[in-house]
Amino acid sequence: EDVAFHIEDLPEATAELQQLLAHHGYDDACIYGHALEGNYHFIINQSFSSEAEVERYEALMNEVKMLVVDKYDGSLKAEHGTGRNMAPFVQYEWGETAFELMRAVKQLFDPKGLLNPGVIFNDDPKCHIRNFKPLTLTNAHVDKCIECGFCEVNCLTCGFTLSSRQRIVIQRE
């Protein structure tokens, strides 16, 4: 995920985000980003193989929402677009009036709801914890891949045959 805080809030917000991740058992979480823009990304190792793991993740995201929006008046999406993971929180962050205006604009351009249905505007408050894409375990190195695409342009073999991510997907299939 990527969130944004006001630059003057970064020291306190960073410490609280770290504490929040640790509180929920994400001791190996990685926070990085673009501090001059107040933009942070965080990556966690998350299994969704049990109801307890799904509940842990749901609790984390609810607290991230409150930390970013309520406490620091920040943004739940900074650099990357709103996806299914943040869809349940769009109205919370923007308020009902702005949310309904954005929904109306989407309806004007996509009256049949064909473009990314449920990605930004989703009436299911738990859409971020449903329909997970399971990743087949293959080996210790490949299993760490979260399919973010970073390797696509940074791999030495990029452009020779398959991309790094394509090779990983093939191993998983």
Q: Model-found features: residue ranges?
A:
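Acidic/polar loop patches that form or flank catalytic/metal-binding clefts of enzymes
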Residues: 73-79, 102, 113-117, 153-156, ...
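Activity-critical C-terminal alpha-helical subdomain
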Residues: 88-137
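C-terminal substrate-recognition/cap domain of FAD-linked oxidoreductases
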Residues: 1-59, 67, 72-75, 83-85
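Local cysteine-cluster metal-coordination motifs and their immediate loop/turn environment
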Residues: 78-85, 142-160
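Flexible glycine/proline-rich, aromatic-decorated loop/lid segments
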Residues: 37, 62-68, 73-79, 160-173
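Ferredoxin-type iron-sulfur electron-transfer modules in oxidoreductases and energy-metabolism complexes
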Residues: 100, 121-142, 152, 158-173
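A glycine-rich phosphate-binding loop feature that marks nucleotide/adenosyl-phosphate handling sites
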Residues: 32-43, 77-90, 117-131, 158
